[in-house]
Amino acid sequence: ILGNTISLNLIIGIGLSIICLLFLDPILRFFGASDQTLIYAHEYMVIILLGNVVSHMYFGMNALLRAASKPKQAMFATIFTVVMNVILDALFILVFKWGIQGAAIATILSQLMALMWQIKLFRNKNELLHFKKGIYRLKRKLVDNILAIGISPFLMNVCACIIVIFINNQLVRFGGDLSVGAYGIANGIAMVFVMFVFGVNQGMQPIAGYNYGAQKLDRLIRVLNLSIIAATAIMVTGWLIAMFLSYYCARMFTTDKQLIDLGIKAIRVVMFCFPVIGFQMVITNFFQCIGKVKISIFLSLSRQLLILLPLLAFLPMIWDIDGVWYSMPISDFSAAVIAGVVMVWYMN
């Protein structure tokens, strides 16, 4: 598994980098970059894509650490990467004045440092998973199993990319570049709390999978309930910050008064249904953990493609730019309801 995971990450990382670098400007245009923002997006993405293999290897190794019952090491790698990214951002942007390129370099370097530490861990021959000869040749059965388990989160990320493309294009169409900037602020704040829930889900995966396989259903339900409580607490905290501290959140990103005002509205609207979306994320992850891939995929698609995409197309025709904003919390609430209904149906 270790060898096949490394090989797949190398192949996919290199392949995606080559394809994206060859067609970078059209891809950025497709994602909603305007004449004013294209040059900055290009500068940033060239560096990110050149270091894409590092990112693939880092995330792959972290997943393997969790699977090998090393959650503390995986958590350390994640926290180390975030902290180093912040430090290097300040150094490269504020001190060296490298601008957007400095931010990209900081991202790749922080992941590279964590990756070197991960490699050191997997070189220990006393560990269950460790490097050795002959494990890197791809095996069809292993690859099929890896891809089957990973298809749900993969589709979630693909859907998220499609939605971001559509949101950006709708925001440019109905509100201009300022609205795109406001969404960037709101999305940046929202992702802080979403990433915490991702962490809860990642910690839940090996525990839920083991107990389901061992038919210890009481422990399975317990870990599910604890994960829902933790995710909900995280998202309620995010909601409180969005509702009452949105000015300070927007102020961290810009000093432009007009953008701050629009950013405040964007933060409050985008995060309005956060108290219920943590539940939806955990339920989706739960079905992935117990091998119910089709249900997990359906719940992944329901929030983004099946609900949000039609709303983004329809509501702006009624409410103009407000329709773009309101489509997001409506989609979040609807997806949480669907997840609840599916969970009740499955339990019965």
Where are these regions (language model features)?
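Short alpha-helical transmembrane segments in multi-pass integral membrane proteins
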Residues: 1-51, 95-150, 208-273, 314-348
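Small-residue-rich hydrophobic transmembrane alpha-helices
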Residues: 1-18, 55-74, 182-246, 277-296
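Alpha-helical transmembrane segments of multipass membrane proteins
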Residues: 18, 26, 60-64, 83-91, ...
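Transmembrane helix-bundle signature of multi-pass secondary active exporters and lipid flippases
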Residues: 48-55, 144-211, 231-239, 256, ...
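A hydrophobic transmembrane-helix motif
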Residues: 162, 303-307
